[in-house]
Amino acid sequence: MGFRLSHLSLALSFVALALAGVAIYRNTYEAIIMKNGSLLKNVSPDFDSLESGVASILTLNNNKKRNSDKYLRQQLTPEACVFSAVRAVVDSAIDAETRMGASLIRLHFHDCFVDGCDGGILLDDINGTFTGEQNSPPNANSARGYEVIAQAKQSVINTCPNVSVSCADILAIAARDSVAKLGGQTYSVALGRSDARTANFSGAINQLPAPFDNLTVQIQKFSDKNFTLREMVALAGAHTVGFARCSTVCTSGNVNPAAQLQCNCSATLTDSDLQQLDTTPTMFDKVYYDNLNSNQGIMFSDQVLTGDATTAGFVTDYSNDVNVFLGDFAAAMIKMGDLPPSAGAQLEIRDVCSRVNPTSVASM
């Protein structure tokens, strides 16, 4: 008797689960109709029986899977389509390698700080013809994520037909999505940037902040881009995520002497040896500033931010309240993303981010 009851109970459980699935799907379906009635008003599936309800679930779910990409393309505005396409590529890249998030943020910074946000850093060198920014000392064997931007560009082309978006725009979106993916505050990214038909090798050397820069040099470089001291300290907070090459940060003159023991690098430095920039390198948090206040910032250029009363005050503000830092960082990134290309630059919307278009469109 007990055996039969247990089987009956099991059978009733399966029936209950099936009915619950039908009810949930029906409620979801009705919610979709409420939201998109004009699209679905002629669809009226029959849920009167368990058999037809379960069959409808299986059929509609299979159709939904096959048609999801097409449906999204039809429903999204052109701008939203671009954001969705880029975000999917960025999320996938960071899921595969968390470090990539910091790399994409840095790539956007290194693009904008050299002659404005013009995608110049993405241009490959051409032997004997063109030397760009990728192999300049601040970027050589260091800047990375080019392939992610290329994938995002192709995804936009495939997913959002008849939408023209620059590679500089894609860099800006990818950086924003990386910040959010790693736990930072998201922020708005306006589209409309253009891509330069050239790059500036020497500009990367002269305009980008370096790990050995003292505070005076850093202030001048940020002032040249119209950033305040507070914005400079906020943007330095990008070092709350990511790694740097040991040969860059764990060498005399670049590393903060007080943090020398934190450099987890081998005695023989190679470009493949990496040093995390704070103690939580995959989380967009305030630990970078906590480390600075404890005199444990890794890079010399970071630790000197505590050597001046004004900048040290901002470091303390951010160490005391992560939300203040996240808000200021987001605002500074928006401002940085608006840095214009050099006056007179020849501009276009590149078809492929790593090379200029075969024939230039008129200057934009």
From Swiss-Prot:
Key words of the record: Calcium, Disulfide bond, Glycoprotein, Heme, Hydrogen peroxide, Iron, Metal-binding, Oxidoreductase, Peroxidase, Secreted, Signal
EC number: 1.11.1.7
PANTHER family per UniProt: PEROXIDASE 59, PEROXIDASE 72-RELATED
Catalytic activity: 2 a phenolic donor + H2O2 = 2 a phenolic radical donor + 2 H2O
SUPFAM superfamilies the record matches: Heme-dependent peroxidases
GO biological process: hydrogen peroxide catabolic process; response to oxidative stress
Listed GO MF terms: heme binding; lactoperoxidase activity; metal ion binding
Binding site for substrate: 209
PROSITE patterns reported in the protein's UniProt record: PEROXIDASE_1 (PS00435), PEROXIDASE_2 (PS00436), PEROXIDASE_4 (PS50873)
Major place of residence: secreted
UniProt protein name: Suberization-associated anionic peroxidase 1
Note accompanying the cofactor annotation: Binds 2 calcium ions per subunit. Binds 1 heme b (iron(II)-protoporphyrin IX) group per subunit.
Keyword tRNA processing appears in the UniProt entry: no
Cofactor(s) demanded: Ca(2+); heme b
A cellular-component GO term for this protein: extracellular region
Family classification: Belongs to the peroxidase family. Classical plant (class III) peroxidase subfamily.
Any Pfam family the entry gives: peroxidase
Keyword Phosphoprotein: no
Gene3D superfamilies: 1.10.520.10, Peroxidase, domain 2
Annotated source species: Solanum lycopersicum
Disulfide-bond pairs as recorded: 81-160, 112-117, 167-353, 246-265
Cited function: Removal of H(2)O(2), oxidation of toxic reductants, biosynthesis and degradation of lignin, suberization, auxin catabolism, response to environmental stresses such as wounding, pathogen attack and oxidative stress. These functions might be dependent on each isozyme/isoform in each plant tissue. Suggested to catalyze the deposition of the aromatic residues of suberin on the cell wall and thus play a role in cell-suberization.
Sugar attachment sites: 36, 127, 162, 200, 214, 226, 264
Signal sequence residues: 1-25
